[in-house]
Amino acid sequence: MLPTLPNIAGRINTMATFLLPVAIGTIILLFLYGKYVTSTLIPGPPTLPLIGNLHQLPSDDRRHVLAQWHKKHGPIISLKFGWSSVVILGNIAVTKELFGKRSLKYGSRPRMVMARDCMTKQMQTSTLPWGEKWKIHNRIQLSLVGGPKIRSYQSLLDIESCKVLYQLLSTESLVTCFNRFKFNIIYTLAYGKDPDQNESDFHEILELADHFTQTLTNATWVVDLFPILNCLPRRLAPWKAVGDDFHRRAMGWFRRNSEAAVKSNSWNWTKHVQFNEDTGNLSVSEMQYLIGVLFEAGVDSTATVLHFFVLACTLYPDAVTKARQELDKVVGSARLPTPKDLPQLPYVKAFIQEVLRWRPITAEGLPHFTLEDDKYQGYDIPKGSTVIFNYWSGHMDEDTYQHADQFCPERWIERPDLPLGVFGYGRRACAGRRLALMSLETLIPKLLWAFDFRSPAGTDHGKSRDPGTEHQGALIKPRSFPVSWHPVSNDRRLIIERLFQERDKDLDTVLDDIGKAFERY
């Protein structure tokens, strides 16, 4: 992803060498030592003129190359792409310090020509620089997916998680079940519409989200390396047509659903934002966009985490046994687990944390941009620097996580202070992290309680092997692996079927109850 991230050229401090009279040489050297001893350039691999380090990074999977550079040069390295310098952070403690504690300095974004200017017309929240517009976007999104009000969504999460369990009784496609889980939640909340009655919207938004990430990660857009080229006329700038086509399609989807949501009888995010939130000087199109992009951020990422959960179940059956024993002791076999049980389920909670750490779903995060000069561990990080967190290296760091390549929920019980940086830090941390975690903590305990996930009989004697991972757009996903699943018992199958039939099918009533609870918080 790195070469496609638009960057702003970093300023590099250099020391000039002067011919000095011998008589005062010692005095000047001492002066320079006192001034510069703590001012050191960030290390990194050697570069070539014009292209920098582009030739050293593979186009598909950069994790191993970056890991080698971090091992050689340390947790903070500097790379060059075209005219732009990029600082890469490969350690969670360093990232937490800079992006978290020093968030005022690191809380902006560099210019992202293809992503921000061409494809989203400066309406995609995650690409906006620090300023009043981003503050409004972030405040509204946090009010919907990040604050205490998300507790009001629990009834909908229970309905959708039970729906996943019921579908798994008969389907052969984990992909569809997991993709629909988060889509159904956000679609229902955003627009007050029944997702089961709008199948085409599901496929269209997945296609748009995939197109956005594929466009950004499968090609090195020259305009991101040399932003001045965006001044060229359209006939000499083919990326402009690509961006315009994407924006037209995305805006059409957002507008169509938003206009229907305003006319809906039930409570939904769109109506709440339009009539209850202070939207400043945002246009109607921008309000529609900032709600719509919540799909891009949440649907595919949650599904990917769930796929890694299933992979962990097939590779580490002993961990599944421990989790299920805990569930049987606390919950029993007569009902499904709920989030209220989690305080009494430390191993199950640790299982979820370890899934998130063991296989981060993205290699590198979106770039941060420094608003002030900074100095860290003797390194100068000038104002206008692009700084990126290497999620994969950070969560595979042996200094932080012993035997980091192993799936080990026990580590979170033995060391509850371990950091988990998958949602980022500071101002630019994932706005929907609380809803994402709430969704996983609702569904995964139910999956552990209800199903056995195993390698099919006859597949390497029933033993599963790690298939490895692959990049699909901006996400890291498991390569295809054989898996079969069946209910833990027939009694649990019957409970799933009964709860599915008894679920509240009146969506307007569900949403109105959510709306009343939402407004009370």
Swiss-Prot record:
Disruption phenotype: Impairs the production of trihydroxy confertifolin and deacetyl astellolides A and B. Heme binds at residue 430. It comes from the Eukaryota. The chain crosses the membrane at residues 14-34. It is an enzyme of class 1 (oxidoreductase). Induction: Expression is regulated by the secondary metabolite regulator cclA. One of its GO terms (molecular function) is monooxygenase activity. It is a single-pass membrane protein. GO terms for biological process: terpenoid biosynthetic process. It is found in: Membrane. CDD domains: CYP64-like (cd11065). Its cofactor is heme. Pathway: Secondary metabolite biosynthesis; terpenoid biosynthesis. Glycans are attached at residues 198, 218, 268, 281. Its EC number is 1.-.-.-. It holds the Pfam family p450. Disulfide bonds: none annotated. Gene3D superfamilies: Cytochrome P450 (1.10.630.10). Belongs to the cytochrome P450 family. This is Cytochrome P450 monooxygenase astF. It comes from Aspergillus oryzae (strain ATCC 42149 / RIB 40).
